[in-house]
Design a protein with these regions (language model features):
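A common structural junction motif
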Residues: 72-74
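Short S/T/G/P-rich N-terminal loop/turn motif that feeds into the first structured element of a domain
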Residues: 1-70, 79-96
């Protein structure tokens, strides 16, 4: 069953370009390290928060990525720019 990891955070507006570049590098590094990432979608809300949604083919793939993240330099680089970070995990139960 597909799962979503949903990260909500803030970023200094001056760091937006850097965030986008580092996130792109992180997505590529995760895809190289762990199979199963279906899509990664980043949105900016009207209130200035960002939401990064990563869709995985299974909970096992998502958990493998979380376990691998500390060994992936791009993860530390991307997360060094964010503040007020929260994470939620969700199971996809219906799609139309």
């Amino acid at each position: 069953m597909a799962t979503l990891r949903i990260d909500r955070f803030t970023v200094d507006p001056a760091d937006t370009e850097q965030l986008l570049a580092r996130r792109n590098a992180l997505v590529a590094a995760i895809r190289d390290a762990v199979p199963g990432l279906i899509e990664a979608r980043l949105v900016r809300l009207d209130d200035g928060h960002w939401i990064d949604m990563w869709r995985w083919d299974s909970a096992a793939s998502q958990q493998a990525a979380v376990a691998a993240a500390p060994t992936i330099p791009e993860a530390a680089a991307a997360f060094s720019l964010v503040g007020n970070h929260t994470t939620e995990l969700a199971e996809v139960v219906d799609e139309r």
